[in-house]
C-alpha cells in the first residue's frame, strides 16, 4: 500500500528537480552569467534568471485591474454592448480627441475625406451640446400627448363690462389705499344733484312733446280694452242687457207683491 504513494512522491520530486535544473542551465548558459567575479555581474545574472522564470511561469492577475487596457482589448470587450464605446476618460483615440473608435472608423472612409469636419475644432463643446439637445427632444416627445404639452403664456383675464362704464383693472397694480378709494368710487359714485335735476327736466319736456310714453316695444305695451284686467271688466255695451234684465226682474217682483 505504501509503495504506490512513495512512487508518486518520487516522480513529482524528480520532475521538479529536472525543471529547476533546466532553468538553471539556461541562466548559466546566458552571456550575463559569464562574469561572476564582481557584484555587478552577479546582479545581472540574477536579473536574467528572473526574466527567464517570469517568461516561462504563468502570469497570475495581480494589480491588472488598476492598469489601463489597450485599445484593441477595449474594442473587443465593448462590441457586444449597445453603446459600443467608452466615456470621455477611457475613449481617447490616437489623435488625442475624446471620440470613440466607432466615429474614428467612420471618419476613415475616403468619402468623408472630401468634406471638411467642422466638429474637429471644438469637440468638447459639441459633446456638451449633444446631451442638452437630447434632453430637449425627449421632453418635447414625452409632453406631446398632453394638451398642456407646450407651455402657455400668462392667461389673460376676461374684461368685465359694468353698466357705469368703468372697466375692472388688475387689483395688483394698485396699492391698498388706492384700492379702497377705487372700490368706494365704484360702489358709491359721486352724483351732482344740479345736473340730475336739469336732465330730468329735459326728459320731462321731451315726454310732454311726444305725448305719453308707452311701451310699444313690448307686446303688452298697450293691450286692448276688452282684455284689460284679465277680461273681468267688460265694455259698457255689454253691460246694457244685464241692466235691462235687472229692471225686468224688479218690475216683475213689484207686480207680484201688488197682487
From Swiss-Prot:
The modification Valine amide is found at residue 152. Glycans are attached at residue 90. Belongs to the POMC family. One of its GO terms (molecular function) is hormone activity. InterPro entries: Mcrtin_ACTH_cent, Melanocortin_N, Opioid_neuropept, PMOC, POMC-derived_peptides. Specific enzymatic cleavages at paired basic residues yield the different active peptides. The gene is pomc-a. Pfam families: ACTH_domain (PF00976), NPP (PF08384), Op_neuropeptide (PF08035). This is Pro-opiomelanocortin A. The modification Phenylalanine amide is found at residue 86. It comes from Xenopus laevis (African clawed frog). Residues 104-137 form a propeptide. Keywords: Amidation, Cleavage on pair of basic residues, Endorphin, Glycoprotein, Hormone, Pyrrolidone carboxylic acid, Secreted, Signal. GO terms for biological process: neuropeptide signaling pathway; regulation of corticosterone secretion. The lineage of its organism: Eukaryota, Metazoa, Chordata, Craniata, Vertebrata. It is found in: Secreted. PANTHER family: PRO-OPIOMELANOCORTIN. GO terms for cellular component: extracellular space; secretory granule.
Amino acid at each position: 500500500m505504501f509503495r504506490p504513494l512513495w512512487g508518486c512522491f518520487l516522480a513529482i520530486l524528480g520532475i521538479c528537480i529536472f525543471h529547476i535544473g533546466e532553468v538553471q542551465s539556461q541562466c548559466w548558459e546566458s552571456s550575463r552569467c559569464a562574469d561572476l567575479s564582481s557584484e555587478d555581474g552577479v546582479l545581472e545574472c540574477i536579473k536574467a534568471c528572473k526574466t527567464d522564470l517570469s517568461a516561462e511561469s504563468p502570469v497570475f492577475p495581480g494589480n491588472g485591474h488598476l492598469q489601463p487596457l489597450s485599445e484593441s482589448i477595449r474594442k473587443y470587450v465593448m462590441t457586444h454592448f449597445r453603446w459600443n464605446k467608452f466615456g470621455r476618460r477611457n475613449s481617447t483615440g490616437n489623435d488625442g480627441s475624446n471620440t470613440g473608435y466607432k466615429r474614428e472608423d467612420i471618419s476613415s472612409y475616403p468619402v468623408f475625406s472630401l468634406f471638411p469636419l467642422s466638429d474637429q475644432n471644438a469637440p468638447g463643446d459639441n459633446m456638451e451640446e449633444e446631451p442638452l439637445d437630447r434632453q430637449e427632444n425627449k421632453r418635447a416627445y414625452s409632453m406631446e400627448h398632453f394638451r398642456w404639452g407646450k407651455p402657455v403664456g400668462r392667461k389673460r383675464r376676461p374684461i368685465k363690462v359694468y353698466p357705469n362704464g368703468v372697466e375692472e383693472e388688475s387689483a395688483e397694480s394698485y396699492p391698498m389705499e388706492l384700492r379702497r378709494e377705487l372700490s368706494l368710487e365704484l360702489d358709491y359714485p359721486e352724483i351732482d344733484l344740479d345736473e340730475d335735476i336739469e336732465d330730468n327736466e329735459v326728459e320731462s319736456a321731451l315726454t310732454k312733446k311726444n305725448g305719453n310714453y308707452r311701451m310699444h316695444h313690448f307686446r303688452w305695451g298697450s293691450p286692448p280694452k276688452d282684455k284689460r284686467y284679465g277680461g273681468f271688466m267688460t265694455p259698457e255695451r255689454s253691460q246694457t242687457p244685464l241692466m235691462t234684465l235687472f229692471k225686468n226682474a224688479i218690475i216683475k217682483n213689484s207686480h207680484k207683491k201688488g197682487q
